[in-house]
């Protein structure tokens, strides 16, 4: 799957057994052996209240905070805007295979590919995360 692809799953079946629910899914990178590195963007704000939250990277290493912020209404693909402020957190990056995704039996909507500059900024932000697995940083 193309890096930067933005998908919407209804529902997304979580690896940890949490209750399935609709979720966005961004493909961040692909490995040679068919593994995708991806994030599950969320509208949940876990950035400390005293931190300045603006579009783009929010890194507060001393507090273990790493997030990338998309503002509501900003066009992220050629045809799509997130309806709410949306966050990608470094600690929530995980790996998946196409088999994992197909096994969910979910309705999957392809919303396009992130604009190249947004994908580059997102990856640069995540590479700064102290709470992301080192192998994931190498994949980015």
For every predicted segment, state its role.
Residues 1-140:
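Conserved functional hotspots at enzyme active or ligand-binding sites that engage polyanionic ligands
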């Amino acid at each position: 799957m193309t890096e930067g692809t933005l998908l919407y799953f209804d529902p997304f079946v979580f690896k940890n057994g949490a209750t399935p629910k609709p979720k966005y899914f961004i493909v961040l990178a692909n490995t040679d052996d068919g593994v995708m590195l991806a994030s599950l963007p969320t509208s949940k704000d876990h950035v400390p209240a005293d931190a300045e939250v603006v579009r783009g990277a929010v890194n507060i290493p001393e507090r273990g905070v790493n997030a990338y912020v998309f503002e509501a209404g900003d066009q992220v693909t050629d045809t799509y805007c997130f309806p709410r402020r949306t966050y990608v957190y470094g600690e929530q990056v995980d790996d998946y295979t196409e088999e994992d995704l197909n096994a969910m039996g979910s309705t999957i909507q392809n919303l396009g590919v992130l604009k190249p500059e947004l994908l580059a900024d997102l990856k640069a932000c995540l590479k700064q995360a102290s709470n992301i697995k080192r192998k994931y940083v190498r994949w980015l």
